[in-house]
Structures are given as structure tokens and as C-alpha cells.
Regions:
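A short helix->loop->beta-strand "cap" motif at the edges of active sites that frequently abuts
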Residues: 23-24, 206-209, 299
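Glycan-processing catalytic domains of CAZymes
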Residues: 1-171, 175-190, 194, 212-214, ...
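Extracellular ligand-binding/catalytic regions of CAZymes and related secreted enzymes
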Residues: 46-55, 64-111, 147-150, 180, ...
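A glycine-rich, often tryptophan-bearing local segment used as a flexible ligand/cofactor-contacting loop or short
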Residues: 188-262
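Residues at the C-termini of beta-strands that transition into short coil/loop
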Residues: 116, 159-161, 214, 267, ...
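Conserved beta-strand scaffold positions in the cores of enzyme catalytic domains, especially
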Residues: 155-157, 210, 281, 301-303
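Active-site Gly/Thr loop motif
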Residues: 265-276
């Protein structure tokens, strides 16, 4: 291939394109397409363009495409001059971003592995169906991937076969994740055989972090549904053990992970998830555990019922990953205390940027790598660049 051109509907779909290596260039075709479904008398293409650009920009700052474009019937855009003016600004901003981040390796604070049946074969392609279209069955999981697409983490996609061939592949990860509904290729199902189970338990027991979202490691076997129930500290009641008393329903609201959580949104609820006796429940509703943490040997397990994309949920996952990695004390390094604002660092150019991901002015405290901090005020969608 000389180049790869693809539709960009989110940060995840942008990384799907931009992370492809070995081609002369990559290009993202941004939304909206110039089609009558958006460009009509009552349509609002400007709003769609704004949401699309700001969402994709998080990922561009981690791994940029080389070119951006729009497609469709150009004549339709002529009736929306404000849209045309905004796209001009987007193009100018992209050129500025590209001049800063092209060929630069951004600072990665942690290394995170996503475990599923596909591994690198579907890098950033988990749960996706036809671009970034919303589906009731997957939005609780695509929010996790969308958050990861803009995090300052080195994200790897690991297949079950990868683990079987070399279990030590896990040792280089700060945290590994398993995300999805039961009996899908993304959660794994029967892929959790003895070599995989042993490798993951050993990894966490020796100090690793494991985060499960939805129905992780799920297969109805040996009287349990979540294969790594002992690591996660939770399991799902299928109706076979209803007379086994489940006493642990106490919620611990004050925790490192939930420190900035004000509005809970777990998406499509996985019903009947309960906690084991030693597990610490952080969020629960109607006798369904939504968020829980568990100690396993030297490591930690974290369970989340789901995670639709919002900047508040992005921060929740960010904190959960640092907690699972036993690195809470390191979180406030290159960190914004306002979850609507991101920070990206580029050591090779001695620069970093502070990014407002909203269309409202934002104020934040920025914590640098040495722990010192300063205040920043940002206009709507603004990016400010600084020297390290």
C-alpha cells in the first residue's frame, strides 16, 4: 500500500488509521460528509464538525495522521458559510499540531495491554462496527477505547495466543485490561484456558494490575462465570447460587479512583454482579456492583460495569489505571486537575501542550513532571504550548 485513507468518527477510529506503519502517508476523512442527511435546511453540520474535530484531536496529539480531508458533494457546503469558515480554522490548527507532533514520540507515563482474541490484528478496532456509529450493545465498551486513544500511555493489544506463546509478555505491562460482553471475541470466553489463566493470575499476584469491564473473562464453568473472579473480586449470579448468601454490599464512597466522580454513568448495566467478601465496592445500584477494587497477592484488580465516553469517565478510568498499577503517587505528573483539559508532552522538542477539550473556557492547575504546578486559563477548544 502507498497510503491508507479512512473515515474518522472518533479518536479510536483515528488511531486505527494513524498507527498503521510502513506506508507513505495516512489520511483521515473527517465528519460530516457533505451529504444531504446533514446538509439540509434544518441540519447542523457545524455542530457535528466541532464535536468530530475535538474528539479526534485527543488522538492526533498522541499519534497524528499525515493529512486530513472532507468528502462528499462540495456544492452542499456552499449554503453553510459558517461551516466553511470553521473548517478553515480546523485545517490551520491541524497544520500547527502537525508541525509540533509529526515524527515526535510523546511521553508515555504507563504501559497498558488490552487482551482479546484479536491482539494487534484489530489494533484499535475492538467493538467497532462501521466507523464510529453508536450502538446500544457496544457504547459501554467503546468509551474505554476512546479514553485510551488519547491517554499518555503506551497501549498494546495482546491476543490470547500471544500469552500462550510467551506468558512473560505481560511482565512489561503496568496494567492489562479485558473489556466486553460474555462469549465475544473481545472478552474471550473459551479462550481462557489453563495457560492463559495461570499467566494472568501469576502476573497480578506478582504486582500487576488487571481491569475488567462488562463481563470480563466470562464463561460459565466450574461454578463461576467470571474466570478471574478471584482477581476482580466480583462474579455474576446466573441463578445457580441464589441461596448462597452475599453479605458484601457496603459502598466505600471515598476512594482514590472516585475522587473526582460526581455523576455516575455505567452505560448498559450488567445485572447481578456481586462482590466477594474481601472486595471493596466503590459504586453499586439496585444490588448490581458497578465499580469495585480487590487486592490479589501483590497486585490489584478493578471491575467496572461499563464506561460510556465522557470526560468525567475518562478521568475515572485514568485514576483506575494508576490505582491498578500501584502508582497513585505518580499520577500528578504532567497532570491537569480539570478533567476537561489534557496535557501532552514531547521530550524531543522540549515542549508540552495544555488542551481544552470543550467549547467552554476552562481553568486548570497543571502539574509538571517535577511536581511543580501553575494555573492556566484556556478559551474554548484552545491549545497552549509551553517549554518543559
Amino acid at each position: 500500500l502507498d497510503a491508507v485513507v479512512g473515515s474518522v468518527g472518533s479518536g479510536t477510529t483515528l488511531r486505527l488509521i494513524s498507527d498503521i506503519k510502513g506506508v507513505k502517508y495516512t489520511e483521515g476523512r473527517f465528519l460530516p460528509y457533505f451529504f444531504p442527511d446533514v446538509f439540509h435546511e434544518n441540519g447542523d453540520p457545524l455542530k457535528e464538525a466541532k464535536v468530530n474535530w475535538v474528539t479526534a484531536r485527543r488522538a492526533i496529539l498522541r499519534s497524528p495522521v499525515d493529512r486530513i480531508g472532507y468528502g462528499g458533494y462540495l456544492k452542499l457546503a456552499l449554503d453553510f458559510p459558517e461551516f466553511i469558515d470553521y473548517i478553515e480554522k480546523v485545517c490551520d490548527e491541524f497544520r500547527t499540531l502537525y508541525s509540533h507532533v509529526n515524527q515526535q514520540v510523546p511521553l508515555n507515563l504507563l504501559k497498558v495491554g488490552v487482551i482479546n482474541s484479536w491482539g494487534e490484528l484489530r489494533r484499535w478496532g475492538t467493538h467497532l462496527v462501521h466507523h464510529a456509529i453508536w450502538y446500544k450493545q457496544i457504547y459501554s465498551y467503546t468509551g474505554v477505547m476512546e479514553a485510551l486513544s488519547g491517554f499518555p500511555f503506551d497501549v498494546h493489544f495482546i491476543s490470547f495466543d500471544d500469552i500462550r506463546k510467551d506468558p512473560t509478555i505481560l511482565d512489561d505491562m503496568d496494567v492489562v485490561m479485558n473489556i466486553g460482553s460474555a462469549y465475544t471475541s473481545f472478552s474471550g470466553g473459551a479462550e481462557f484456558d489453563e495457560p492463559v489463566i495461570t499467566a494472568l493470575r501469576r502476573y497480578v499476584d506478582q504486582g500487576g494490575g488487571f481491569i475488567g469491564v462488562g463481563e470480563p473473562t466470562a464463561i460459565n464453568r466450574n461454578g463461576k462465570f467470571f474466570t478471574l473472579y478471584d482477581v476482580l473480586g466480583v462474579d455474576k449470579e446466573l441463578g445457580f447460587t441464589m441461596h448462597t448468601d452475599k453479605y458484601n454490599w457496603k459502598v466505600h464512597p471515598n476512594h482514590f479512583i472516585t475522587e473526582q466522580l460526581e455523576h455516575e454513568d455505567w452505560g448498559e448495566c450488567v445485572n447481578d454482579v456481586y462482590a466477594l467478601p474481601e472486595t471493596e465496592i466503590l459504586a453499586e445500584k439496585d444490588l448490581h456492583v458497578n465499580l469495585a477494587v480487590n487486592e490479589y497477592g501483590k497486585g490489584r484488580g478493578v471491575y467496572m460495569n461499563g464506561l460510556p465516553f465522557s470526560f468525567e469517565n475518562v478521568r475515572l478510568l485514568y485514576r483506575a489505571i494508576f490505582f491498578a498499577a500501584h502508582k497513585e503517587e505518580e499520577m500528578k505528573r504532567w497532570y491537569s486537575d480539570n478533567y476537561n483539559v489534557d496535557i501532552n508532552v514531547y521530550p524531543s522538542t522540549n515542549s508540552f501542550c495544555v488542551v481544552n477539550n470543550t467549547y467552554e473556557p476552562q481553568t486548570t492547575t497543571v502539574y509538571k513532571g517535577d511536581g511543580t504546578s501553575f494555573e492556566v486559563e484556556l478559551d474554548a477548544c484552545e491549545i497552549k504550548w509551553f517549554e518543559i
